[in-house]
């Protein structure tokens, strides 16, 4: 998993509340367990017309936001059924940070396991960031995980809080496998001691 230390990029505004996982990645795209290629299905029902052509009114189809790395979204983002394909689709599209006032718990935790930073802010701060994100190609935000702050295009700072363990994992690029490997020496030591004290179980 790639480390997340500081991210600077275009922020796309999605002022919609209760965006559920079916909206993020429709069920038709859940037939694969591969993490790559799902970016095409991200918000598919909103991004594409019935004939498969792009909907020019959807934010991620607009020229200024095609390479967005940050999503500023409405309250309760990622609600609905549990599907890890949702953060996979965001990541495959290129989005590594989602900012909202709240997230569904399962989606929130799945983000950290896949290298995406979900940030919770107050409604006042979200309104400011949504306004910043509406500036098109000038909607540049910098998310600094080390200092827990977001810098807007006008230089304004917004602080945010994050669980220290989750912060450590993102800063060091540690998913579940990485966390296990990080404890490799301790695991090896335990296995040797356990084998010596319980030779019949070796």
Curated annotation (Swiss-Prot):
GO MF term (any one): 3-isopropylmalate dehydratase activity
Pathway participation: Amino-acid biosynthesis; L-leucine biosynthesis; L-leucine from 3-methyl-2-oxobutanoate: step 2/4
UniProt cross-references to CDD domains, sorted A to Z: IPMI_Swivel
Gene3D superfamilies recorded: Aconitase, domain 4
Enzyme Commission number(s) of this protein: 4.2.1.33
InterPro entries reported in the protein's UniProt record: 3-IsopropMal_deHydase_ssu, Aconitase/3IPM_dehydase_swvl, AconitaseA/IPMdHydase_ssu_swvl, IPMI_Swivel, LeuD
Catalysed reaction equations from the record: (2R,3S)-3-isopropylmalate = (2S)-2-isopropylmalate
UniProt KW keywords: Amino-acid biosynthesis, Branched-chain amino acid biosynthesis, Leucine biosynthesis, Lyase
GO terms for biological process, alphabetical: L-leucine biosynthetic process
UniProt note: phenotype after gene disruption: Nodulates the roots of pea plants as long as branched-chain amino acids Leu, Ile and Val (LIV) are added to the plant growth medium, but forms fewer nodules compared to wild-type. Nodules infected by the mutant are more spherical and contain more starch than those infected with wild-type, however the bacteroids appear visually normal.
GO cellular component, one term: 3-isopropylmalate dehydratase complex
Taxonomy, superkingdom: Bacteria
Pfam family, one: Aconitase_C
Known function: Catalyzes the isomerization between 2-isopropylmalate and 3-isopropylmalate, via the formation of 2-isopropylmaleate.
Family recorded in the similarity comment: Belongs to the LeuD family. LeuD type 1 subfamily.
Subunit structure: Heterodimer of LeuC and LeuD.
UniProt-recorded name of the protein: 3-isopropylmalate dehydratase small subunit
Gene responsible for this protein: leuD
């Amino acid at each position: 998993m790639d480390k997340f230390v500081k991210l600077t990029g275009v922020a796309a505004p999605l002022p919609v509340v209760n965006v559920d996982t079916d909206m993020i990645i429709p069920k038709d795209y859940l037939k694969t367990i591969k993490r790559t290629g799902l970016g095409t299905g991200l918000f598919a029902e909103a991004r594409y017309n019935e004939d498969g052509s792009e909907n020019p009114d959807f934010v991620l189809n607009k020229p200024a936001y095609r390479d967005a790395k940050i999503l500023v979204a409405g309250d309760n983002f990622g609600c609905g059924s549990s599907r890890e394909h949702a953060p996979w689709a965001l990541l495959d599209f290129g989005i590594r940070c989602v900012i909202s006032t709240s997230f569904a718990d399962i989606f929130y935790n799945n983000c950290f396991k896949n290298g995406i930073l979900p940030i919770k802010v107050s409604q006042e701060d979200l309104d400011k960031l949504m306004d910043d994100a509406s500036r098109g190609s000038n909607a540049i935000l910098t998310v600094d995980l080390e200092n827990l702050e977001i810098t807007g295009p006008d230089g304004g700072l917004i602080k945010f809080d994050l669980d220290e363990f989750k912060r450590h994992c993102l800063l060091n690029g540690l998913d579940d496998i990485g966390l296990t490997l990080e404890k490799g020496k301790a695991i090896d030591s335990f296995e040797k001691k356990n084998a010596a004290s319980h030779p019949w179980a070796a």
